[in-house]
Regions:
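C-terminal motif of bacterial Sec signal peptides marking the signal peptidase cleavage site
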Residues: 2-5
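Cross-family detector of peptidyl-prolyl cis-trans isomerase
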Residues: 7-282
Length: 282
């Protein structure tokens, strides 16, 4: 069964009480750490991988015959991400991740389009979302934890066969575990209970850089404040975010005709005031 549960707007309409973000994070982080200390993944299956091989990542309890397995807790790295609470205070959240195979190509940004296969799990092992065959997804439209994990993986190589089929090699493989503050928090979704930490297992096949308004400025560059929210950057205050606005500064000159006319890779700044022409009214 396939669910579609990793998009930001795939939420449950049921009203759930809003918990304090900081307190909820502490509770969930403790649960995640407990899970990681008591579980391992099948790391032996990933030794000496062939370039196009991708065994399924499987989690299991460290008990019985598995008592000597290395816990996930000893293998993960941590990415700290700030999340705003209801009062606009920032609360740091830990995203735990492990890269099994990094990949050999470019890394996506949080704004790019990615071609991935993945599986989403709750801490109890129940799968809520799976794509065995890769699909294209817009990273900026995904829940924060999934979105922030993707740039840690690199794309692989692609080979197109004579019959029109294609194969991927040396693509990135990894998993991430994160609290609900980076997921659905109180809203949950059809298949995810409110306040649920999530696990995503991901294969990063390939990517496309995005320029959503075709103004010659990559969407990631349109995130002027670097907060990975592309809707709150609106230089000319016309209620059209820069990544969808073909005239970012509202001066009547299209951004593509102001951005980098000499093609040196540096945004033009004709008056030398430190503000690029495409964002400068004067």
């Amino acid at each position: 069964m396939i669910f579609f549960s990793c998009k930001k707007d795939d939420t449950n309409i049921t009203n759930i009480p809003l918990e304090d973000l900081s307190q909820q994070y502490t509770l969930e982080n403790d649960s995640i750490i407990q899970f990681m200390k008591s579980h391992f993944f099948n790391y032996d299956d990933f030794n000496d991988l062939s370039p196009n091989d991708s065994p399924e990542i499987v989690f299991d309890s460290i008990i019985g015959d598995n008592i000597d397995k290395t816990p996930i807790y000893e293998q993960v790295s941590t990415l700290q991400i700030s999340v705003k609470d209801a009062d606009d205070n920032l609360v740091n959240h830990n995203l735990y991740y492990h890269i099994i195979r990094e990949g050999i190509g470019e890394n996506p940004t949080v704004a790019d389009s990615v071609f991935v296969s993945y599986k989403g799990l709750l801490l109890d092992g129940v799968s809520f979302d799976t794509r065995k065959n890769p699909i294209w997804m817009e990273a900026k439209n995904l829940i924060r934890g999934f979105q922030e994990f993707l740039p840690l993986l690199s794309k692989g190589d692609i080979r197109v066969n004579n019959n029109g089929t294609y194969e991927f090699f040396n693509f990135g493989i990894g998993f991430a575990i994160f609290p609900s503050g980076l997921g659905y928090f109180q809203s949950g979704s059809i298949s995810i209970p409110p306040y649920s930490p999530l696990i995503f297992k991901v294969n990063m096949m390939t990517l496309n850089r995005t320029d959503h308004d075709n103004d010659s400025v990559l969407t990631i560059i349109e995130d002027l404040n670097g907060d990975h929210d592309f809707n709150n950057d609106d230089t000319d205050s016309d209620n059209i975010p820069n990544f969808l606005d073909d005239d970012d500064d509202g001066d009547g000159v299209l951004t593509m005709n102001e951005y980098d006319l000499n093609k040196d890779g540096i945004p033009d700044d004709t008056d030398g005031d430190g503000i690029p022409d495409y964002l400068d009214l004067d």
